[in-house]
UniProtKB/Swiss-Prot annotation:
SUPFAM superfamilies: HIV integrase-binding domain, Tudor/PWWP/MBT. Residues 7-64 form the PWWP domain. Residues 86-473, 562-671 are annotated as: Disordered. Keywords: Coiled coil, Cytoplasm, DNA damage, DNA recombination, DNA repair, Isopeptide bond, Myogenesis, Nucleus, Phosphoprotein, Ubl conjugation. This is Hepatoma-derived growth factor-related protein 2. It comes from Homo sapiens. Interacts with HDGF. Interacts with trimethylated 'Lys-36' of histone H3 (H3K36me3). Interacts with trimethylated 'Lys-79' of histone H3 (H3K79me3), but has higher affinity for H3K36me3. Interacts with IWS1. Interacts with H2AX, POGZ, RBBP8 and CBX1. Interacts with histones H3K9me3, H3K27me3 and H3K36me2. Interacts with DPF3a (isoform 2 of DPF3/BAF45C). Interacts with SMARCA4/BRG1/BAF190A, SMARCC1/BAF155 and SMARCD1/BAF60A in a DPF3a-dependent manner. Residues 138-150, 195-210, 234-244, 310-364, 423-473, 565-577, 586-595, 612-664 have a biased composition (Basic and acidic residues). GO terms for molecular function: histone H3K27me3 reader activity; histone H3K9me2/3 reader activity; histone reader activity. Changing W21A: Loss of interaction with histone H3K36me2. The gene is HDGFL2. Residues 521-581 form a coiled coil.
Length: 671
């Protein structure tokens, strides 16, 4: 059965995360927040904090003194043991009145006081620091198992304690209004005023505990508030994870803007004890307050420090962004400069190449004396142009960067030379004055020549570049040329023959011919072109070449066989024609004999008829011979053409003989 307690009983109170702490059951003041049912208002010695706990977490002091009354490392625990024995009626005392300006004043150093000072103000802080450390450590060591089971109960205990402390403060504030000189609005809103008057000063625990929020001097005794975590509290936080905060009310955030951040030595917030403060010998530890929600209770000073940190971070980010922008701008500038330099170098190289080409052409083209004179004239012009920069206009081919480089390179060499050559120049100054004019006249002539030659070379190069297209393009061009050359209206045989020759020289593959079947079709058609035999022969040659290249030596063998067969056929046809001509000749002779007998002509007439018959035979033989080569190859055609005039010659001799015979017969008749 849990023990029944009365106000004023001394007990050991157990709160999760802390050892059994020396405490006292408090009275419920009029107007104060009533504790929940089955819970007692507890006042913790050493820390002077309050909470609401059930009877199961309370143990009588006298019975459990030997068990739980051992010293502990927790700060505030040993002070609580001393206080429960020597000053069991210790309570919060009203601190002196605090104005709005006092909130800005630095807090008294908690380590400056001693236990001998019994003032109400000094006693509070001392008790807070001492009891907090010792009691918390003892409780943590002894009841770590019970801590795990009572997670939710701790939260419930802290909320009623919060309410009770608020009520106590309200009562104290109402009793001490005259002393504190606080406005009635502050009395009514005790909770808000206590929150607004909390400080941001934090003391760091050298041991495992987080810093405690120190109390501010104010009309209402505030409770210790949990500090907002700072960078320096990382160690204390890490340690306090295992050990829960001491039995204290839940921390509250500073809601009013009237509270200003204090500029104490430590830039961290400290919890506020409820009723009084006492300078502690040790730095204030984080007492019994739990840390369920550290984000909620940032005080005005912590918010200021956070804002300062945010400002620093924002300034750092701005600086980084500015640096990045500067670096990017520099990189862009460097890239642009590099591109410009590369372009300038390319231009210079192009100009140098042009100049070299022009000079080489000029040296090649300029012959004998004229070239020598121009060179002799150019050398002094260059020298003078280097010495006097603005006198002679530079040629169009000279590039500016080259001139600058030459000038800079030869300045140093000319300075010592100028002193030695000045006396030698004086007598021949007139000649030099006359020479520049001649040089200027000769220079444009040379420039024009070089320009013309460069234009000619450029045209030739362009033509060469244009003539370098692929085989397919050449095929298509030649095909179009052949078509245009063999127009019905105005055929151009020479152009067609040239195109066919080029087509025959092309190295054509089967793939190209498969793509361009029109070319093969046109060649087949041109083989039958009757208007000109040369075109026919050339087309046949090109066609056979293409075939031989594409299909290989097999077709050549087949073609040879075909040619041999054709030649045999032609020979047989010739023999048949000759036999027919031989048979026709005796028939004609037989016919001529009866005709002579019947007609009985004169000698001259008979001879003339014989001559005509002979001529007819010869003409028939000539026709037969002409028909033969037509059916034959192109070589036979050439032979027949050559033999044509030879066939006419015997005919003409016979005509002359017949004329001579006719003349002789006429003379005989006259005689």
């Amino acid at each position: 059965m849990p023990h029944a307690f009365k106000p004023g009983d001394l007990v050991f109170a157990k709160m999760k995360g802390y050892p059994h702490w020396p405490a006292r059951i408090d009275d419920i003041a009029d107007g104060a927040v009533k504790p929940p049912p089955n819970k007692y208002p507890i006042f913790f010695f050493g820390t002077h904090e309050t909470a609401f706990l059930g009877p199961k977490d309370l143990f009588p002091y006298d019975k459990c003194k030997d068990k739980y009354g051992k010293p502990n490392k927790r700060k505030g625990f040993n002070e609580g043991l001393w206080e429960i024995q020597n000053n069991p009626h210790a309570s919060y005392s009203a601190p002196p009145p605090v104005s709005s300006s006092d909130s800005e004043a630095p807090e008294a150093n908690p380590a400056d006081g001693s236990d001998a000072d019994e003032d109400d103000e000094d006693r509070g802080v001392m008790a807070v620091t001492a009891v907090t450390a010792t009691a918390a450590s003892d409780r943590m060591e002894s009841d770590s198992d019970s801590d795990k089971s009572s997670d939710n109960s701790g939260l419930k205990r802290k909320t009623p304690a919060l309410k009770m402390s608020v009520s106590k403060r309200a009562r104290k504030a109402s009793s001490d209004l005259d002393q504190a000189s606080v406005s009635p609005s502050e009395e009514e809103n005790s909770e808000s005023s206590s929150e607004s008057e909390k400080t941001s000063d934090q003391d760091f625990t050298p041991e495992k505990k987080a810093a405690v929020r120190a109390p501010r001097r104010g009309p209402l005794g505030g409770r210790k508030k949990k500090k907002a975590p700072s960078a320096s509290d990382s160690d204390s936080k890490a340690d306090s994870d295992g050990a829960k905060p001491e039995p204290v009310a839940m921390a509250r955030s500073a809601s009013s803007s009237s509270s200003s951040s204090s500029s104490s030595d430590s830039d961290v917030s400290v919890k506020k004890p409820p009723r009084g403060r006492k300078p502690a010998e040790k730095p204030l530890p984080k007492p019994r307050g739990r840390k369920p929600k550290p984000e909620r209770p940032p005080s005005s000073s912590s918010s200021d420090s956070d804002s300062d940190e945010v400002d620093r971070i924002s300034e750092w980010k701005r600086r980084d962004e500015a640096r990045r922008r500067e670096l990017e701008a520099r990189r862009r500038r460097e890239q642009e400069e590099e591109l410009r330099r590369l372009r300038e170098q390319e231009k210079e190289e192009k100009e140098r190449r042009r100049e070299r080409a022009d000079r080489g052409e000029a040296e090649r083209g300029s012959g004998g004396s004229s070239g020598d004179e121009l060179r002799e004239d150019d050398e002094p012009v260059k020298k003078r142009g280097r010495k006097g920069r603005g006198r002679g206009p530079p040629s169009s081919s000279d590039s500016e960067p080259e001139a600058e480089l030459e000038r800079e390179a030869k300045k140093s060499a000319k300075k010592p030379q100028s002193s030695s050559t000045e006396p030698a120049r004086k007598p021949g100054q007139k000649e030099k004055r006359v020479r520049p004019e001649e040089k200027q006249q000769a220079k444009p002539v040379k420039v024009e020549r070089t320009r013309k030659r460069s234009e000619g070379f450029s045209m030739d190069r362009k033509v060469e570049k244009k003539k370098e297209p692929s085989v397919e393009e050449k095929l298509q061009k030649l095909h179009s040329e052949i078509k245009f050359a063999l127009k019905v209206d105005s055929p151009d045989v020479k152009r067609c023959l040239n195109a066919l020759e080029e087509l025959g020289t092309l190295q054509v593959t089967s793939q190209i011919l498969q793509k361009n079947t029109d070319v093969v079709a046109t060649l087949k058609k041109i083989r039958r072109y009757k208007a000109n035999k040369d075109v026919m022969e050339k087309a046949a040659e090109v066609y056979t070449r293409l075939k031989s290249r594409v299909l290989g030596p097999k077709i050549e063998a087949v073609q040879k066989v075909n040619k041999a067969g054709m030649e045999k056929e032609k020979a047989e046809e010739k023999l048949a024609g000759e036999e027919l001509a031989g048979e026709e000749a005796p028939q004609e002779k037989a016919e001529d004999k009866p005709s002579t007998d019947l007609s009985a002509p004169v000698n001259g007439e008979a001879t003339s008829q014989k001559g005509e018959s002979a001529e007819d035979k010869e003409h028939e033989e000539g026709r037969d011979s002409e028909e033969g080569p037509r059916c034959g190859s192109s070589e036979d055609l050439h032979d027949s053409v050559r033999e044509g005039p030879d066939l006419d010659r015997p005919g003409s001799d016979r005509q002359e003989r017949e004329r001579a015979r006719g003349d002789s017969e006429a003379l005989d008749e006259e005689s």
